[in-house]
Design a protein with these regions (language model features):
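Beta-strand-rich binding/interaction modules
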Residues: 124, 204-217, 227-251, 258-260, ...
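Short flexible loop/turn segments that cap and initiate beta-strands
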Residues: 56, 227-234, 273-278, 652, ...
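Active-site-adjacent substrate/metal-binding segments within catalytic domains
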Residues: 67-100, 104-125, 130-133, 140, ...
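Accessory beta-strand-rich segments of carbohydrate-active enzymes
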Residues: 28, 35-39, 84, 89-191, ...
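Substrate-binding clefts and catalytic carboxylate motifs of secreted carbohydrate-active enzymes
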Residues: 26-46, 55-56, 65-66, 163, ...
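Extended acidic/polar, glycine-enriched regions
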Residues: 148-149, 210-220, 225-308, 691-694, ...
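Short, hydrophobic beta-strand segments
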Residues: 143, 260-269, 686-692, 774-793
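Bacterial Sec-dependent N-terminal signal peptides
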Residues: 1-23
Length: 816
């Protein structure tokens, strides 16, 4: 019996994960077999109004599967904006033919898009279903009024002609999943199920569950009215063994919201170490069983407490939030990122010691929230980066040259209320979400808002003033007014979590209603205000919403009980916000674009991890002119030093040790060298200067950690490995099997039984990596690369063969 219940629970978990954010009816992905055409005058491909019509001939269009980001299929160009990673946008159409067999007579049919960038227009058989300018919003359209008895055609126009509308790479296209949903005439509302933990102890928990139905305006016949009178809803909470641990029932109308109460005995809490997930199943019971509707969502029971003096507590335990910010992309994949790629990235961040993710600066793909629920990571969900005025979008490098001012501000007033509400309704069932952010750096001084306080008060402050108060600029008081409006929208939907905002101009915002409009106030790069503002505003809850990687920024958290945490900029390198050409993105992450840990990631692990940590990197010790013309050696350790032990014999080499131990010793070919290491107070790193000899360099710390570097020979062969069906790793190795970290050999991949989505090496400065013609060929960086693989449907095995001139190739066969 227990096995049967466990199987049932696994099925429910799969259903919840598969259907993602579709919380009613029967949902089916329709990602396969779309026709795609990018319309571009430069390519002599013109747009025609008939492209939305059912009868339009799209047989010559390219076939693509979703999710799809056309931006990374095209070459980078210095003529494009550095803000978007020198990648193009444009206008494109997608079309999908839905056979009549996929539709069920007598039911309503919907189409649900998790995300389309941007300015989407969706048509069914030539009829406009709706428009959504936001490229980050998820949205649902009712197809029923325009369905025909034969095949039906969905056409989607995507307009990213304003290519410079974001400060980072957004991608272009239908870059998230699309779902076809079938439901009875009266059904549970999309995102209509929500729960709140109202009380919990070891023996009992009380959970309130909202149930909402949709059917208003459709219940017209007497038969349907009779059905409506007999509607009821049953709510069940199911544990991991498949056992129903709490249940409640209520009558409900065809377009009504009801709240029921569940009592759970011996509740299991959702924690970061043990993220226990129940299943919350809601059944809308109609007069006939075939008219029933079901919603299944995951549920985690946890408490959140915030204090201006003690910080933040999860489940009553006060803790520090060790967060990072992340953007949507994954390098060569653009923003069409498979779930397993995110799983690997999040697992690496968690291994470093990260316990929270700030989803910058927009709602992300639903699968990412599912992973954070499963893996035990807190999430700060963020609505937008821009309000009623545009920010600077840099064209020739970060903060360089003349900016553009395209942006999402063009539809702010019309859509922001809906976009914020939809974010909260969509994501409120995720236990990982602990903060709702209404905006990022909307208060940057004179970009565009200004205030007399920018003239200074004689005491000085750290925020850039850009020439002081500019009365011709928009009045900063507007920020507080908008913040009050957006915070109210959030709290009306979900009073169980606090609102926040990430403030860039704290001093200026303190002169407005913005900080008081939100429950928790985020400070971007303003550690110097932590103590001052804690005294000035003793009821304010403060944390670092965006921070540098340096040790003083982290000590500002650990040394101040009232500061509950920080979010590093960033957790992972990302496309866009690039430096000068040919940089395709920002290298501010703990992980590179390929998802590999950088030395900076090891440095953060030494600060955050509870496990023993040791890493060594090396660089040549060169003389540099000091003050008064004297020469001096490199005294401050470079914490970004690469892990390599290939130098010239006799070179003086600096060896940097990053560790959470207090002391370490260095061994070269088994003999201790370097003596007692120097300790750098500014970074906490240890360092030796030693004479280079080939062989094995090993560091051992006093807390039991160790790290080795080995001198490698010439490139000899390719080593091909995998950690899952999503990733295949290719390394250039010498005859001893050691990775040659200096190798940049070109690798060609041949894949059978699967689709090669792309190859990534993590090199932020490589402008040749984009473009479809480059998809199966790439030079290694640091002697390695990762290939992203998507198995074909129905296949149980696929093969990857790697080759490179003058090297022995490698072949890997993977069984699913």
């Amino acid at each position: 019996m227990k096995k049967l219940l466990t199987t049932l629970f696994a099925l429910l978990m799969t259903t919840a994960g598969t259907q993602a954010q579709v919380s009613f009816g029967h949902a089916e992905k329709i990602n396969k077999g779309w026709s795609f055409l990018r319309v571009d005058s430069a390519w002599n491909v013109s747009e025609r109004p008939a492209m939305k019509e059912k009868a339009f001939d799209d047989t010559r269009w390219r076939k693509v599967d979703l999710p799809h980001d056309w931006g990374v299929e095209l070459p980078m160009s210095p003529d494009k904006g550095s803000c978007q990673g020198y990648l193009p946008g444009g206008v494109a159409w997608y079309r999908l033919h839905i056979p009549v067999g996929k539709l069920t007579e007598g039911r309503r049919h919907y189409i649900y898009f998790e995300g389309v960038y941007n300015y989407s227009e969706v048509y069914l058989n030539g009829h406009l279903l709706g428009k959504r300018p936001s490229g980050f919003a998820s949205f649902l359209y009712d197809m029923t009024p325009y369905l025909e008895k034969d095949d039906n055609v969905v056409a989607v126009r995507v307009n990213h002609a304003q290519e410079f509308d974001s400060r980072w790479y957004t991608g272009s296209g239908i870059y998230r999943n699309v779902w076809l949903v079938s439901a009875p005439e009266v059904h549970l509302a999309q995102w209509g199920t929500a729960y709140r933990l109202t009380a919990i102890n070891k023996s009992k928990a009380t959970v309130e569950v909202d149930v909402e139905t949709s059917g208003e305006g459709r219940v017209k016949s007497e038969e349907l009215k009779i059905k409506n009178e007999k509607l009821s809803a049953t709510v069940e909470l199911i544990d991991k063994d498949g056992k129903v641990v709490a249940t409640a029932k209520t009558t409900i109308g065809s377009s009504e919201k009801k709240t029921v109460k569940l009592t759970v005995k011996n509740p299991q809490r959702w924690t970061l170490e043990r993220p226990y997930l129940y299943m919350l199943r809601t059944v809308l019971n109609a007069a006939k069983a075939e008219d029933n509707d079901t919603s299944v969502v995951r549920a985690g029971l946890r408490t959140l407490d915030f204090s201006p003096n003690k910080g933040f507590a999860l489940n009553g335990e006060w803790m520090k939030v060790k967060g990072v910010c992340v953007h949507d992309d994954a390098g060569v994949l653009g923003v069409a990122v498979p779930k397993e790629v995110w799983r690997r990235r999040l697992a690496e961040l968690k291994d470093i010691g990260v316990n929270a993710i700030r989803l910058s600066h927009n709602p992300h793909a639903p699968e990412l929230y599912d992973l954070c629920d499963e893996m035990g990571l807190l999430v700060m969900d963020e609505a937008s980066d821009e309000w009623e005025f545009p920010k600077r979008k840099w064209m020739k490098g970060w903060n360089a040259g003349k900016p553009e001012f395209q942006g999402t501000y063009t539809y702010f007033e019309e859509w922001i209320d809906r976009d914020v509400a939809d974010m909260v309704r969509r994501d409120r069932c995720h236990p990982c979400v602990f903060l709702w952010s209404i905006g990022n750096e909307v208060d940057y001084p004179n970009d565009p808002y200004s205030h007399p306080v920018l003239n200074g008060d004689g005491t000085g402050f750290t925020q850039p003033a850009y020439g002081g108060y500019k009365p011709e600029q928009p009045n900063a008081e507007r920020i507080g007014i908008i913040a009050q409006r957006l915070a109210k929208i959030v709290k009306d939907i979900d009073p169980s979590r606090p609102t926040t905002g990430a403030l860039a101009g704290v001093v200026m915002s303190n002169a407005t209603a913005y900080p008081s409009a939100v429950d928790v106030v985020g400070y971007n790069y303003t550690e110097s205000r932590y103590g001052i503002d804690h005294k000035t505003y003793p009821e304010r809850i403060i944390y670092g919403s965006e921070n540098r990687h340096d040790l003083p920024a982290w000590k500002a958290v650990t040394d101040n009980e009232h500061i509950f945490g920080q979010f590093l900029w960033t957790g992972i390198d990302y496309l866009g916000e690039s430096g000068q050409w040919p940089a395709r993105g920002s290298s501010a992450g703990l992980l590179d674009l390929a998802g590999w840990r950088k030395p900076l990631g090891w440095y953060r692990a030494a600060l955050l991890s509870t496990k023993p940590v040791c890493y060594i990197g090396t660089y040549r010790n060169v003389s540099r002119p000091g003050r008064n013309g004297n020469n001096r050696r490199n005294q401050r350790p470079n914490i970004n030093a690469p892990g390599r032990w290939n130098w010239e014999k006799g070179d003086s080499v600096n060896v940097v040790c990053i560790t959470n131990g207090k002391d370490a010793r260095l061994l070269l070919n088994g003999k201790e060298v370097g003596g007692k290491p120097g300790h750098d107070e500014s970074t906490g790193a240890l360092m030796w200067s030693v004479a280079y000899e080939p062989g094995t360099l090993r560091c051992e710390t006093d807390n039991g950690a160790a790290y080795e570097l080995t001198t490698t020979g010439k490139p000899y062969a390719l080593k091909v490995t995998t950690d899952s069906v999503a990733h295949v790793f290719v390394e250039v190795v010498d005859e001893g099997g050691n990775t040659v970290t200096t190798a940049d050999n070109e690798v060609t991949l041949m894949v059978r039984g699967a689709r090669l989505l792309g190859m990534e090496h993590g090199n932020i400065a490589d402008a040749t990596i984009t473009g479809r013609q480059q998809r199966n060929r790439l030079r290694t960086h640091g002697g390695r690369l990762v290939a992203y693989i998507q198995p074909e449907e129905g296949t149980t095995m696929f093969t990857v063969r790697a080759s490179s001139p003058f090297l022995e190739g490698g072949t890997l066969t993977i069984n699913r």
